[in-house]
Amino acid sequence: MSEATTSTETLQDEAVLLVGHGSRREKSNEQVRELASELEGRLGLPVDAAFLELAEPAIDEAIAGLARTVSQVSVVHLSLFAASHVKNDVPLAVTQAREAHPELTINNGAHLGVHPAILDLLDDRVAAVEAELGVDRTDDEVAVVVCARGSSDPDANADVHKLARLLYEGREFGRCEASFIGVTEPLLDETLHDIAKTRPDAVAVVPYMLGDGVLTGRIKDGAREFDAEYPYVDAAPGEPLGTDNRLLDVLGDRWQEARTDS
């Protein structure tokens, strides 16, 4: 990343560390770096990327590098949910970094979570599926499934249900359900079979994932298999969140919250 700074005095000695999970698929890691670069342009200060596992640099290594050039680092999580990594792994790494660099102020931010920009992005993903299937929520019965990876953490799963409910509110969907590809219930297959009983005109299955990885592929396959099994219901999968600019809105808000303790 460039060592860009702003003319605002309070930001001249500050940097952001965007923490992604890390993957064996380099494409997924590049997504984190791409978002870091775009966030740097948005905020006008240095933004570096770090990873929890499977990719480099690790959090401690990245913070050590930043400690040489700035006096304040705000850690921002590129995580959809507040599961164990957000609740345990990152805070531990931040605590250790504070001990290693007592001269450095390190702020630990929140995960992406539930945010109006994400709801807007999900709505657009559904609209793209409607266009593909030739249906319109105002004239046709369109059901939506928001499908996430599933977690052993109840807070993470609750966020998916909340997102599905908020996506339904104020929009003309027939129904909007939360489902999961593993770990917890309801699983995608059972959710789709339950929806089929009501015979909607179309079902849009939206992967609540950042990238187009293995789990996103399973979600898309599940939607296509359902479409083949139920000829009286048109179904198709949407795209994951990707690197849409609206994620920068969320990350920018999480950065501001982290550095101001709000």
Identify the function of each model-found stretch.
Residues M1-S262:
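Active-site-proximal alpha-helix that buttresses catalytic centers in soluble enzyme cores
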